[in-house]
Regions:
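Extracytoplasmic ligand-binding site segments that recognize negatively charged/polar headgroups
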Residues: 62-78, 99, 113-259
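A ligand-binding cleft/hinge motif common to bilobed small-molecule-binding domains
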Residues: 125-127, 262-279
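Bacterial N-terminal signal peptides
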Residues: 9-17
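Early extracytoplasmic/lumenal segment of secretory-pathway proteins
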Residues: 40-127
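Conserved small/polar residues in nucleotide/adenosyl-binding loops
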Residues: 303-309
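Periplasmic-binding protein-like
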Residues: 147, 229-238, 276-300
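Bacterial lipoprotein signal-peptidase II cleavage site
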Residues: 21-28
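Positively charged n-region of N-terminal signal peptides that target proteins for export
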Residues: 1-5
């Protein structure tokens, strides 16, 4: 029974990704005697009956997700999506975040965790499947799976989407300070450029860091050749002398404050940064980049949860 509750959350998570849920914005007056207004967001769904069926069952579930993926209402006018989910379904979401796939993996592998929903990346999903860490999904309980684009339903890491439902995809490029760095000079090799020593940030996760080094060396970004991996590792060691820090979400503060001027990161996050800081730009080098998919999964440890009680 618990799995059905969890699958309901997966389906809700897919609403925004598939377009079945709508975030509406409207203006409300701050006071009766002023013309100042503020934008307020709310969520509506096409089939509310499906999502309200557990409303009075006193259910709570634990979600472990990337740090910047779901709005928490901390910005003015931006909704708290988990709170909206609870309002709609009656299901309480206990929400925590991680910065890397490796952090997620270590937490689950160490045991003692009771997460119901996780959102790892493609390569980590493949590893978790091989290590029997993920629960097979019953697609009949995930109606919004039908709204996922077909090209994302079949992949090397989970060929039939037996264990995962694609949530988002993106690419990696380079965020840079346009007042210091010329776009025409940007390739992956700029991350090794001694002219910018101490002002370069680098990924604090092996998958994306190795992909950049492999690209520079002309290797497949998915190589499993031990010699090529060793050479990529040496390339990354060479870079260390020019790197200010190895980061993930810390990039927002460091690039925003001007502490660093060059950093590889994800396209979606780059858009967020550029919206806030007009001097930042984003480039995908001509030599190419990697495409990633993050997907919703249920870890086998979900069965350790106590079954829900009536409210």
């Amino acid at each position: 029974m618990m799995k059905k509750f969890i699958l309901a959350l997966i389906s809700m998570s897919l609403l925004l990704a598939s377009g079945c849920a709508h975030i509406e914005e409207y203006d409300t007056e701050e006071t009766a005697d002023t013309e100042e207004t503020t934008e307020v967001q709310t969520v509506t769904v096409d089939n509310p009956e499906y999502y309200t069926r557990f409303k009075n069952d006193g259910i709570s579930i634990n979600v472990y997700n990337w740090g910047e993926y779901i709005p928490d209402g901390s910005e003015e006018g931006v909704l708290n999506l988990n709170a909206e989910f609870t309002k709609l379904t009656g299901i309480t979401v206990n929400y925590s975040t991680y910065a890397t796939n490796e952090e997620l993996y270590a937490k689950l592998k160490g045991g003692g965790s009771t997460y119901d929903i996780i959102i790892p990346s493609d390569y980590m999903i493949s590893r978790m499947i091989k290590e029997n860490m993920l629960e097979p999904l019953d697609k009949s309980n995930i109606p919004n799976f039908a709204n996922i684009m077909d090209k994302f339903k079949s992949s090397e890491y989970d060929p039939s989407s037996k264990y995962s439902v694609p949530y988002t995809w993106g690419t990696v490029g380079i965020i840079y300070d346009t007042t210091v760095v010329d776009e025409e000079d940007i390739g992956w090799d700029i991350l090794w450029d001694e002219d910018y020593s101490g002002r370069i940030l680098m990924f604090d996760n092996p998958r994306d860091a190795f992909a950049i080094a492999e690209n520079m060396l002309g290797y497949s970004l998915n190589t499993e050749n031990s010699e090529e991996l060793e050479k990529a590792a040496e390339k990354l060691k060479e870079q260390k002398k020019v790197v200010q820090a190895y980061v993930m979400d810390e990039i927002f503060d460091k690039m925003g404050a001007g502490e660093a001027i060059i950093a590889p990161y994800y396209a979606g996050d780059a858009v967020t940064l550029m919206d806030e800081y007009e001097d930042l730009g984003f480039v995908i080098p001509d030599s190419g980049t990697n495409l990633f998919i993050d997907a919703v999964c249920i870890p086998v440890s979900y069965t350790h949860l106590t079954l829900p009680t009536k409210a």
